[in-house]
Design a protein with these regions (language model features):
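Nucleic-acid-interacting cores, centered on viral/eukaryotic replication and modification enzymes
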Residues: 1-184
Length: 184
């Protein structure tokens, strides 16, 4: 469907530009995958390699066409179910799982807010995970063709370094939680 919808393609490109501008991946580190693996093994180091894939959804699809709150939302997500190391084996992670607040916490906050003289607020962090730096084993990514710079046309299998905790990375939630705790 995305291939047949120019608006969906544009939504994905817009999201990719936002993520690149934020420094999520570094296009200046581009190199051939085979060279990355060869150099990494020669140095006795570890790397992880994954694919980023685009998705697109329609927000406000229940609204009439043309409504200002009905729009396409592009997302770029790391395929966390298939991250490989320099030997093409499944990658092993630090298991930095995040601990989202449970239902009990939510109810306690609601209760506090219902007490006379008290109030509560909530908000959603804009592009939350990619506010956090990605740690651990360096992760290199294959960008989808629509997000690759023209200068990459000479590469057979280009990869670049992932710098921020992109959605889909198995440890992204843990890095986001650590980032959030540091700033609270």
């Amino acid at each position: 469907e995305i291939n047949d919808d120019p608006d969906a393609q544009q939504a994905i490109k817009d999201e990719g530009k936002r993520l690149e501008k934020q420094g999520t991946w570094d296009i200046n580190t581009v190199r051939e995958y085979d060279n990355l693996v060869k150099d990494t093994k020669a140095k006795g180091e570890k790397v992880h390699v994954a694919r980023i894939f685009p998705i697109c959804s329609e927000k406000g699809s229940e609204l009439k066409k043309g409504h200002p709150e009905r729009k396409l939302k592009g997302r770029c997500v790391l395929e966390g179910s298939d991250v490989r190391d320099e030997n093409k084996d499944s990658a092993i992670f630090n298991e930095l799982s995040s601990s989202p607040a449970g239902l009990e916490v939510s109810k306690a906050v609601d209760c506090y807010g219902s007490i006379k003289g008290h109030s509560i607020e909530q908000c959603d962090a804009e592009q939350a995970y990619v506010q956090a730096k990605l740690g651990g084993t360096p992760t290199w990514v294959r960008l989808p063709k629509e997000l690759r710079p023209e200068s990459w046309a000479k590469y057979k299998d280009p990869v670049c370094l992932l710098k921020l905790a992109l959605y889909g990375h198995p440890d992204a939630g843990g890095y986001w939680e650590a980032h959030c705790n540091k700033h609270l």
